[in-house]
Swiss-Prot record:
Primary residence: cytoplasm
Keyword Ribonucleoprotein assigned: no
Entry function: Reversibly catalyzes the transfer of the carbamoyl group from carbamoyl phosphate (CP) to the N(epsilon) atom of ornithine (ORN) to produce L-citrulline.
NCBIfam families, A to Z: orni_carb_tr, PRK00779.1, PRK14805.1
A GO cellular component entry from the record: cytoplasm
Gene that encodes it: argF
Catalytic reaction(s) noted: carbamoyl phosphate + L-ornithine = L-citrulline + phosphate + H(+)
Subcellular localization(s) per the UniProt record: Cytoplasm
Gene Ontology biological process: arginine biosynthetic process via ornithine; citrulline biosynthetic process; L-arginine biosynthetic process
Chain residues that bind carbamoyl phosphate: R100, H127, P128, C129, Q130, C260, R288
Protein name as catalogued: Ornithine carbamoyltransferase
Family of the protein in this entry: Belongs to the aspartate/ornithine carbamoyltransferase superfamily. OTCase family.
Length: 301
């Protein structure tokens, strides 16, 4: 593994190795406290962030490394200078680049013109670190992730794409339940289905919640993306039937709940569920750090 732009670039064994390493780092942090000693990692944020920034900054520190934060003003890639020059300069100083960007093309440019590993911490198409944290969380409750049935409910987006691709590679069953007109990208769904054929997994896209009866895990995400100015009344009209609430859990028999956050309580998920016995949401948030640490350790070993 030279970079992490999308989980589709990883093999099943590479994903399992990352999950195993994440568990090891989580269980024995002292053993890895100097694993990145002398390493400097530039973290770039074109979009606002809480979990991504904090988990990378603290995670790098816990591994003995040094994180340098660049926001959209100081790291305006392609505006103050070209992606080519940006990548070439950063590569002379830093040991790796972690980038949360608007466009996947920016990440491809950083890889093409830089000479250090690049980690996608979110773009328009994928959110690989999130998906690794999600399956790390699932693996803490299910011994064989290939037998897990995971339902994503809401708008098809970068998180949906990465969940489908990761599940497909691992041999799991992943169903995206989205309102009509809000399905995940058709080309990425096709890629996930092809990967599932190889692994024995299954990928489904539907607008029918009856399709996820007897599933193991349900996953929610915000209905309103950053910068989306759609009136709330319109959003609620379209998505309220897909709210993750106690009634839906009882109807489907689903045991565990995930949400990548930020969560809009009483919209895509109720407080009763988010704070209830079925929720793994804050374990999932913690696991962002451990999964990302495993990625950095693998890239910089």
């Amino acid at each position: 593994m030279e970079n992490l732009l999308s989980v589709k670039d990883l093999s099943k064994q590479q994903i399992l190795d990352l999950l195993a390493l994440a568990k090891a780092v989580k269980a024995n942090p002292a053993e890895y406290s100097q694993a990145l000693a002398g390493k400097s990692i530039v973290t770039i944020y074109e979009k606002p962030s809480l979990r991504t920034r904090v988990t990378f900054d603290i995670g790098i520190h816990k591994l003995g490394g040094h994180a340098v934060y660049l926001d959209a003003q100081n790291g305006a890639i392609g505006e103050r200078e070209t992606v080519k020059d940006f990548a070439a300069n950063i590569s002379r100083w830093a040991d790796a680049i972690v980038a949360r960007v608007v466009s996947h093309k920016t990440l491809e440019g950083l890889v093409e013109h830089g000479s250090v590993p690049v980690v996608n911490s979110l773009c328009d198409l994928y959110h690989p670190c999130q998906a690794l944290a999600d399956f790390l969380t699932i693996s803490e409750h299910y011994e064989d992730v290939s037998k897990v049935k995971l339902a994503y409910v809401g708008e098809g987006n970068n998180v949906t794409h990465s969940l489908m691709l990761t599940g497909a590679i691992l041999g799991a069953e992943v169903t995206a339940v989205c309102p009509r007109g809000s399905s995940p990208d058709a080309q990425i769904v096709k890629q996930a289905m092809a990967l599932a054929e190889i692994s024995g997994g299954k990928i489904n896209v539907t607008d029918n919640l009856d399709a996820i009866v007897d599933y193991d895990v349900i996953y929610g995400d915000t209905w309103v993306s950053m910068g989306d100015d759609t009136p709330l009344a319109q959003v609620k009209e379209k998505y309220m039937p897909y709210q993750i609430n106690k009634a839906l859990l009882m109807r489907t028999g689903i045991k565990h709940v995930l949400h990548c956050q930020p969560a809009h309580r009483e919209l895509e998920i109720t407080s009763e569920v988010m704070d209830g016995e079925h929720s793994l949401i804050f374990d999932q948030a913690e696991n962002r750090m451990h999964a990302q640490n495993a990625v950095l350790l693998t890239l910089l070993k």
